[in-house]
């Protein structure tokens, strides 16, 4: 097997993203399965990690749409990346964007946009990849009757009016949700300008209804608006590594998507490895042998001499055992190009792998460049600091770095592991939290929850130990005991009082300490603004001498406690508490001119 015929336009590369259980895999399987059914012998080519649906098959499936969407297809077809989800999509990376030309964002039409959908939208935005929305599971809409057609438009015309109204309601909900994310969206058959509006295509991955429109819109959009990007380049290949695998009887191979140019056997290629750029020679280009079923075909590989973009192939070469998934792969025609691409790769990898010893943040370890980049980007959006981000298993160094962080900032003493495990013999100490997951959005959720839990726990502990601002007035006529200890009725005018809080007068003199607080004859651990409670106060104090009925007292807040409150826990400081703080500062400054200096009240 040696040849492929060069094309004027290459096939667009399509990825499928969306929330878990919204039907990504089912939709992809339906598209592939439908294409297999509709093909003629020789029409479908098998690829590694991808499925090519040729134009002839797209035209057959979308035959019912000829009148609605008249378009003469010039692209050779569509290349679908086989594994859905943004974990693998992350590896389809290239400088300034993505290897993917367009995406299908699968959304359950009943459930609408969910957390992982938002994560997918964020990564599509960051990689500047346009997308269409497949509003899946229309068969779940109440009263929907499945029709024997791949066309949504044919099917909707045969539904009862109430079912159509139901569908419109769900589509409208989706339009609103997408608008909240900054996208103007509409049902595809109501769009006038596809450059300004995201197309929503109602579909059932289960019955196949809507598959015709999905393929037709994908083909039409890419052909009409991406011609320059899709122009076939005759030059040396550029690609990206999806996965690195060990093949029995052969050795390490790389599953590669070629998005530009031609890759030939014996080409010199430059790619990223764990320890730096790898320069090696292509020993073999492998593709699955043609079989009826694409999935079955993947186990039986055949060699070809060259491959044109866009294609998914398996590349066998020496020294691939340390190659990084998500790495660019370049064909170099001479030594000068080898050095040029080594430098480019070094810069790209350095931009993703990260270490900053001055940052007390989390440690991130991932299995590929793409997933690491996606996780770092996701953490940055959430304002979670990162100390170290790298590829590969968890090492002793990672533990040491996490321990340093945990000493200073317990909430960030985390090792976040994406599809990697600790090296053999490495144990995670108790003070370090290992958070591991195979789905990015779940990893993010777990990291955020842990940080929040630790912060809340630390906050509770700290607020138990510091003195908070409080202001009370001794209510005239409510003196139950005049001394040793004094027991009086008080009104809390602002802030909070608690047992063990010291009390001061307006002139700054300390009069004693709160022993106990009772509300309706029941002991309570605090009293806040507006409450009238009985308090016992111990110290050198007597009502009528050191304090008077009707007198106002303040909690004795140490300078350090006020600093902690205003710098770390300002969110609990109420308006009435701020007024009390200002009064306490005025009192305290008669004895300490630096008390409360530099505090921000806004």
From Swiss-Prot:
UniProtKB keywords: GTP-binding, Initiation factor, Nucleotide-binding, Protein biosynthesis
Residues covered by region (G4): 136-139
Protein name: Probable translation initiation factor IF-2
Protein origin, superkingdom: Archaea
Region ranges (G1): 18-25
InterPro entries: EFTU-type, P-loop_NTPase, Small_GTP-bd, T_Tr_GTP-bd_dom, TF_aIF-2_arc, TIF_IF2, TIF_IF2_dom3, TIF_IF2_dom3_sf
Function: Function in general translation initiation by promoting the binding of the formylmethionine-tRNA to ribosomes. Seems to function along with eIF-2.
Region (G5): 204-206
Family: Belongs to the TRAFAC class translation factor GTPase superfamily. Classic translation factor GTPase family. IF-2 subfamily.
CDD domains linked: aeIF5B_II, IF2_aeIF5B_IV, IF2_eIF5B
Segments of this protein annotated with the region G3: 82-85
PANTHER family with a match to the protein in the record: EUKARYOTIC TRANSLATION INITIATION FACTOR 5B, TRANSLATION INITIATION FACTOR IF-2-RELATED
Chain positions covered by the region annotation G2: 43-47
Keyword Nucleotide-binding: yes
């Amino acid at each position: 097997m040696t040849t492929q015929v060069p094309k004027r336009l290459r096939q667009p590369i399509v990825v499928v993203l969306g929330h878990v259980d919204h039907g990504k895999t089912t939709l992809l399987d339906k598209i592939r399965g439908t294409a297999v059914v509709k093909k003629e012998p020789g029409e479908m080519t098998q690829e590694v990690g991808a499925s090519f649906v040729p134009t002839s098959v797209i035209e057959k499936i979308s035959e019912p749409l000829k009148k609605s969407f008249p378009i003469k297809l010039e692209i050779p077809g569509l290349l679908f990346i086989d594994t859905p989800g943004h974990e693998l999509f992350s590896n389809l990376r290239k400088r300034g964007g993505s290897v993917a030309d367009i995406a299908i964002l699968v959304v359950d039409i009943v459930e609408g946009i969910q957390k992982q959908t938002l994560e997918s939208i964020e990564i599509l935005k960051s990689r500047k990849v346009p997308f269409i929305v497949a509003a899946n599971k229309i068969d779940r809409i109440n009263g929907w009757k499945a029709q024997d057609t791949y066309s949504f438009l044919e099917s909707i015309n045969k539904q009862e009016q109430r079912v159509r109204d139901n569908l419109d309601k769900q589509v409208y909900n989706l339009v609103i949700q997408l608008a909240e994310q900054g996208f103007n969206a509409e049902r595809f058959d109501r769009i006038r300008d596809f450059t300004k509006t995201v197309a929503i295509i109602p579909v059932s991955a289960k019955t196949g209804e809507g598959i015709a429109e999905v393929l037709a819109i994908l083909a039409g959009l890419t052909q009409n608006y991406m011609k320059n990007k899709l122009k076939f380049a005759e030059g040396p290949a550029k690609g990206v590594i999806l996965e690195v695998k060990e093949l029995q009887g052969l050795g390490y191979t790389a599953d590669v998507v070629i998005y530009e140019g031609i890759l030939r056997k014996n080409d010199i290629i430059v790619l990223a490895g764990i320890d730096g750029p790898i320069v090696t020679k292509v020993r073999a280009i492998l593709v699955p042998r043609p079989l009826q079923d694409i999935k079955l075909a993947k186990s039986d590989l055949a060699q070809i001499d060259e491959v044109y973009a866009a294609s998914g192939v398996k590349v066998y070469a020496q020294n691939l055992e340390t190659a990084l998934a998500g790495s660019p792969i370049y064909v170099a025609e001479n030594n000068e190009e080898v050095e040029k691409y080594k430098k480019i790769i070094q810069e790209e990898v350095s931009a993703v792998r990260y270490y900053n010893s001055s940052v007390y943040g989390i440690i991130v370890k991932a299995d590929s460049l793409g997933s690491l980049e996606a996780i770092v980007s996701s953490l940055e959006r959430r304002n979670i600091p990162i100390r170290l981000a790298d590829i590969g298993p968890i090492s002793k160094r990672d533990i040491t770095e996490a321990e340093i962080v945990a000493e200073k900032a317990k909430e960030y003493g985390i090792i976040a592991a994406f599809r990697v495990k600790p090296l053999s013999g490495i144990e995670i100490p108790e003070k370090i939290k290992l958070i591991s997951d195979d789905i990015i959005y779940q990893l993010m959720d777990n990291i955020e929850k842990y940080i929040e839990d630790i912060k809340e726990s630390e906050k509770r502990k700290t607020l138990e130990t510091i003195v908070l601002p409080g202001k009370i007035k001794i209510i005239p006529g409510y003196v139950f005991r005049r001394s040793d200890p004094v027991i009086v009725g008080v009104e809390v005018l602002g802030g909070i009082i608690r047992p063990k809080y010291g009390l001061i007068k307006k002139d700054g003199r300390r009069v004693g300490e709160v022993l106990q607080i009772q509300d309706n004859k029941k002991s309570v651990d605090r009293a806040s603004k507006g409450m009238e409670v009985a308090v016992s106060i111990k110290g050198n104090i007597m009502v009528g001498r050191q304090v008077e009925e009707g007198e106002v007292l303040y909690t004795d807040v140490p300078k350090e406690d006020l600093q902690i409150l205003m710098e770390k826990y300002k969110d609990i400081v109420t308006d009435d508490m701020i007024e009390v703080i200002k009064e306490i500062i005025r009192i305290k400054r008669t004895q300490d001119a630096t008390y409360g200096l530099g505090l921000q009240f806004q």
